[in-house]
């Protein structure tokens, strides 16, 4: 099972991938949204492992943990919304825009990051 440190490394990798794109010119905005979501997912998995030794797993199981764990409940809505945007991009083929990413996706990710990182060891 991946450790807290491994999940954090993958979260940083996904975040770096998302941030490398010029949002005004890239044709890959769907991948940007997806990368922000997976960065958030690995932050959630890092905290689940750190607090309760819960391994990462299926999206449905993780969603239930985000709803039920007291240390994750505060980001329940942000996590769900970010996941929904990612699914819009991946499965429903909804066109993403730089404005949507700047005004919705990045703030959602940042709220999750700001909630989780202080709870993890330095």
Predicted feature residues:
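Terminal alpha-helical segments
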Residues: 1-122
């Amino acid at each position: 099972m991946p450790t807290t440190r491994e999940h954090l490394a993958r979260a940083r990798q996904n975040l770096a991938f998302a941030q490398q794109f010029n949002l005004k010119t890239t044709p890959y905005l769907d991948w940007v949204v997806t990368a922000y979501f997976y960065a958030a997912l690995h932050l959630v998995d890092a905290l689940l492992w750190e607090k309760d030794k819960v391994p990462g797993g299926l999206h449905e199981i993780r969603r239930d943990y985000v709803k039920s764990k007291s240390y994750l409940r505060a980001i329940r809505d942000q996590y769900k919304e970010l996941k929904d945007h990612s699914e819009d991009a991946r499965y429903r083929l909804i066109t993403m825009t730089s404005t949507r990413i700047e005004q919705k996706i990045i703030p959602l990710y940042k709220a999750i990051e700001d909630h989780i990182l202080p709870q993890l060891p330095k």
